[in-house]
């Protein structure tokens, strides 16, 4: 038997993969999709669906979010009034069979960019999935911040159609933000 044939017949060996083998360390996060506790003032849900270029749900994706708190400060920032027990700043949710995800959070406050320019309240979103060799990065902006959105340095660089793909829509318990990977209504992604 050749070495190659032996590798395919010996139980317990990891099969070769394009980007593998799979290493799941730290995939489940401690807080999962809960950026804030349920009792946190202003707690809301950001829910959505991830769709491929044909409009089909992506059932095995991972949505990660990072954001500032309502005061515009990130978790771990110095300050006496930050409650690190109830605000984590990070959420992670696997998409279900219908491509849906949900993150419990609060609406973030505006933050300053590295060059000091005030940015509109937003949530950073990373998306990982089978078939993607690199993660996709986008942002969620809020429809009730028209003045801040009109001045946001990143949003103003985009054409009006791309800009609309980054603005969530209000829902009964928070906001809805669908992520479209390709096609006519493709979400704007950033290459950073």
Please describe what each predicted stretch is:
Residues 1-192:
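Beta-strand-dominated extracellular/periplasmic modules and repeats
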């Amino acid at each position: 038997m050749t070495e190659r044939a032996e590798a395919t017949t010996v139980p317990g060996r990891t099969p070769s993969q394009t980007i593998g083998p799979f290493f799941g360390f730290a995939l489940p996060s401690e807080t999962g999709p809960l950026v804030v506790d349920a009792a946190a003032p202003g707690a809301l849900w950001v829910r959505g669906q991830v769709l491929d270029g044909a409009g089909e749900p992506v059932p095995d994706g991972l949505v990660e979010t990072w954001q500032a708190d309502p005061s515009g400060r990130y978790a771990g920032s110095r300050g006496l009034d930050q409650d690190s027990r109830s605000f984590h700043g990070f959420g992670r949710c696997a998409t279900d069979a219908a491509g849906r995800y949900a993150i419990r959070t609060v609406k973030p406050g505006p933050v300053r960019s590295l060059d000091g320019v005030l940015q509109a309240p937003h949530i950073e979103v990373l998306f990982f999935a089978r078939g993607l060799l690199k993660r996709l990065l986008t942002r969620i902006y809020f429809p009730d911040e028209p003045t801040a959105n009109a001045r946001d340095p990143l949003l103003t660089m985009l054409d009006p159609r791309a800009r609309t793909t980054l603005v969530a829509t209000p829902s009964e318990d928070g906001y809805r933000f669908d992520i479209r990977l390709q096609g006519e209504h493709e979400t704007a992604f950033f290459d950073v």
